């Protein structure tokens, strides 16, 4: 009976021995020596035939004793941390590896096989040869990643190449590597290096086979405006990351925050949408600093970005709502009673904007935004705000003119005022999209900097507003010789000589066709002074010091007033109002309140009166475009300082201000001829070789009387010589 019991248990023990993995905690007992085995061998009647030592399990690694069993069952044997771990697999022992040195080359049953090579490919009759094989072939050309080595494998493994459809299986596979992250099989070492690098660029540095407790997060934590966010290691490369974060767009995020803060003073709560969340930094700033005044929705189509947005919400102790279900981190959220909830969605931006209505929509796609304008104006609420950030500056700044014609349907060339031209192109596209939805727009401000073009408009519902908006889209006549420009006159009649509209006389003095037609462009004002002053107040209230100089420049530019004549801090004028200790100048046409103090909308008569008032005050709008003082400097003359020249233009009776589009640009209602004449009047001739080297010319500020030039000097300045 005992022999029968042993025979019944023996197959079970064999099966357990085949799946047993040698680990540091439970090492397999080494096989007894040949002499000892013969002495203790049972009788032939009761003993089965002597079996070979069980081969090591090829699917598990002994170096992961602390990893869960599920992780161990999936990790391939070719992935090891040390060479000793690989040798343990080969010799099947944890202790003295030299115990296998007693192998006899004459005993064919004790031939050692490589755990990563088939038997027909490699056979070792000595432990030394097996060690050299493991070290020189498998370990030497392995790929290292986070302390682990992906050794080359020659086994007949199943080729795995994950795709959207599923796993692709091929019939032939030679030497290959097993990816530690996605278990894909890669044949070449260089391809394996590139494969792992792509995982790192996407932020997929955690192995699927390592538990979350042992894996270290490779995401970097950044802080901007008291908001913490996690970003991927390659967050600054938009082509290779799922969640792009650009630190250079900080001004863009701050000015949009001031816009939303100014709108939140009109009505509460606001339903806001960040259609392209990426890391969610913008929506997090809205919810964290404005609290219950806003209901923020952050959307992104990428699954990894949505996961990262949820992590950033928990990092900033904000409640996350996904599919009408509230997800909380657990601890730390009880103190956030003033912070608003954030709804995170994963769908196409066009679909989301068609399904829901919002008071504030921000569009910041990668490139042009024309594909999302129709859906943005489809359901935006009346008197809501739509902000559009365009980063396709190569087409807007006339470097790729065919792309601008394709996306915006306009003809442009490179001019001295190309940044304002880009802003007017985007506003025209926004206005046309709003008009298709029977809505008009009021431009609150437009900003064009080095990296982006930002346009913010207020939506006015109704076909009347749409018609008024459509009338403000006109063509521009641009002179290619002197760069004078003017918008075409209203009307559909064809003029016999359109060159007469230009103030310059280049067509009569120069041969050929001298002017081109640009556009269609937005021809009305680009700034709302009252709204900009409220934005300045919000920036001071929230402590955004970086954006205040830009907003002040926009205010001066909207009023077309030099900064020396208009100060936002000096309460010297009775027409100025105080906002939190900051005095800002107010005019009759700047304060436009659509909502009463109780947050309710005023009557339609009030809105009609406001529209009439805007129409009567149209003459106070700032002049379009600007001149670059360096571009029109006179040869052989030293031009005056910029501040002094602004005062000279103002004293001559022209409206003048600086512009944010160009640091050396001057916005004025003077024509180019008048601009050059005043520049010539206050310029001084350059000192030539007759002056000694040590003599320093007098500074321009000390010059009180303008320099009178003779007729010959004027002729030389204009480029002509009088004989």
Curated annotation (Swiss-Prot):
It comes from the Eukaryota. Residues 1-10 have a biased composition (Acidic residues). A zinc finger (C2H2-type) spans 177-199. GO terms for biological process: adult behavior; adult locomotory behavior; tRNA N2-guanine methylation. It is found in: Nucleus, Nucleolus. The modification Phosphothreonine is found at residue 23. It catalyses: guanosine(27) in tRNA(Tyr) + 2 S-adenosyl-L-methionine = N(2)-dimethylguanosine(27) in tRNA(Tyr) + 2 S-adenosyl-L-homocysteine + 2 H(+). The modification Phosphoserine is found at residues 61, 603. Residues 32-44 have a biased composition (Low complexity). The keyword Transferase applies. InterPro entries: SAM-dependent_MTases_sf, Trm1, tRNA_met_Trm1_C, Znf_C2H2_type. There is a cross-link at residue 576 (Glycyl lysine isopeptide (Lys-Gly) (interchain with G-Cter in SUMO2)). This is tRNA (guanine(27)-N(2))-dimethyltransferase.
